[in-house]
């Protein structure tokens, strides 16, 4: 993980979306040292993908780009349909015989918040993206499947995108099947505040929901940093405050220092209001 760094900006960010290795000979070597169960039964190998707005650290020595910090308090969520967990979603994109996976959160009748670098894996075709809200594992999707319809990238540099999905086979909207998450106005968000990042890390069995617990260490502009640990596949995970409101969308981190999300400040909130008619910001 020490070479082939991109030079778009001065800070190196470890990408936290899981995707398929195109170089299969290299992929086989990487995958052998990791938990194969998180890749499903097809032995699909994974690597990070490039974000359109951040320096991404290419995965060289491990399949799942990760920023594991001293605070590695991660635990599995089994009651995925309960409370605010219901809106947390597993994102799946088939790519070149394999797949990419990430995370997101339902925030409107038809809308999911995630990262640009996650939806970019669909190569411009949102119908390649499947969303499974409150997924329990690769064989148990209690709230079914929704297919992407439209991608709306945030106009700024921040790694944020809205994914609009079509109704399911029963003509139900995703925001009818699960209760959309509440967005925090962030007027009270502070340093040292307790937070959680909840999503679908790639080092765990496929499509299992995990929560990481930590504290805010920095707030500035459209960036929120924290001291908790994350792994590839967590990209797009919602960052929840103590009221279970979304204060950010996780995208990456810096080795041995911190993890980061897009902070939902006033500019981001206006973007959400402009594109999600029923967005709930409190």
Swiss-Prot record:
Coiled coil start-end: none
Catalytic activity: Preferential cleavage: Glu-|-Xaa, Asp-|-Xaa
EC number: 3.4.21.19
Residues spanning the membrane: none
Residues annotated as signal peptide: 1-27
Similarity annotation: Belongs to the peptidase S1B family.
This protein's name: Glutamyl endopeptidase
Organism in which the protein naturally occurs: Staphylococcus epidermidis (strain ATCC 12228 / FDA PCI 1200)
Gene: gseA
